Amino acid sequence: MRKNLWTFQFGGEASGLVGSAMVSQHFVVLLMSLYCLTQSVVESSSWWSLGMNPVQMPEVYIIGAQPLCSQLSGLSQGQKKLCQLYQDHMQFIGDGAKTGIKECQYQFRHRRWNCSTVDNTSVFGRVMQIGSRETAFTYAISAAGVVNAVSRACREGELSTCGCSRAARPKDLPRDWLWGGCGDNLDYGYRFAKEFVDAREREKIHQKGSYESSRIMMNLHNNEAGRRAVSTLADVACKCHGVSGSCSLKTCWLQLADFRKVGDHLKEKYDSAGAMKLNTRGKLVQVNNKFNSPTMNDLVYIDPSPDYCVHNESTGSLGTQGRLCNKTSEGMDGCELMCCGRGYDQFKTVQTERCHCKFHWCCYVKCKKCTEVVDQFACK
């Protein structure tokens, strides 16, 4: 019956066999295309999505919590296993991702690429499939966010496997100052972030010397740079004790820096990021040997940045059409650079602000609301 069907469609037994082979070939191609598409979706999904859809707790951890980890989008197999072992950590990984995303958007708010998110589990879209310096920054700031969130959660007693910092007393701390209190557990936060964030890269298997292997090395390097930024900027904080605030005695502990400082630090590293390439041994080396080799504290990239001026679905660029710009600025936020020479439209908006604020005894400030019509400019 099947033979007759093909004969009917292709006009004869011989042509039927050829037709069957052709259809089979097309079917295989279709399956391969679907497989590649599925793999692309899997590869593009990321644990960053935990920052977009916060993990609910505590009820999800009560009984049979393993399904939770399989339901969380963007996790690799290794990350799902860590989720099953450390389920109470997942909320703070999400917090760290969210902190990293927000800081990325703040640091690039005046740039053509402004760290915009998209409505899927890749979070940043196809632009992250390019090994650019923007991708390097994103990996670093998100890894830093996890260190920050987990270290702080330890200090606040939110996690069952860690507590206050046990960091050694700094050698330069004055003798009469006490080393104690409850510091941020940077050591634990660093180690857990390394285990979790790097898991996705370490479980990938690609041929040595391939582009994919260079991306893995790039991602791991920038993850480490992000973690080290948090570690480098952490400092000693102290509290005074004594009669009438005389500060005759101080208690000190290790404290994380404000995350804005981490963002500023990594933004500087972004501006000076090193362009890399694969050598014959399958290692990343500098493209230009005239510069100092990047350290583990620096960011590295392997691809030039795409054109962020125009919308391009293949690269993930959203373009700058409709972006607000500063008419009087000569910087990246200025209309000339932001709009890529396309010009801009002017429009008026009404802004409401607090004004004429007065302090009243005791103890509050009362303000009026003032409205103002202002000119704004948006790229064509």
Curated annotation (Swiss-Prot):
Please report a single Pfam family linked to this protein: wnt
- What are the recorded GO MF terms, alphabetically? cytokine activity; frizzled binding; Wnt-protein binding
Q: Which residues form the signal peptide?
A: 1-40
Indicate where a lipid (O-palmitoleoyl serine) is covalently linked: S244
Its predominant location is secreted
SS bonds (residue pairs): C104-C115, C154-C162, C164-C182, C238-C252, C240-C247, C309-C340, C325-C335, C339-C379, C355-C370, C357-C367, C362-C363
A cellular component term, taken from the record's GO annotations: extracellular region
| Glycosylated position list | N114, N120, N312, N326
Q: From which domain of life does this come?
A: Eukaryota
Q: What does this protein do?
A: Ligand for members of the frizzled family of seven transmembrane receptors. Can activate or inhibit canonical Wnt signaling, depending on receptor context. Plays a role in normal embryonic development.
Name of the protein: Protein Wnt-5a
Q: Which organism is it from?
A: Xenopus laevis (African clawed frog)
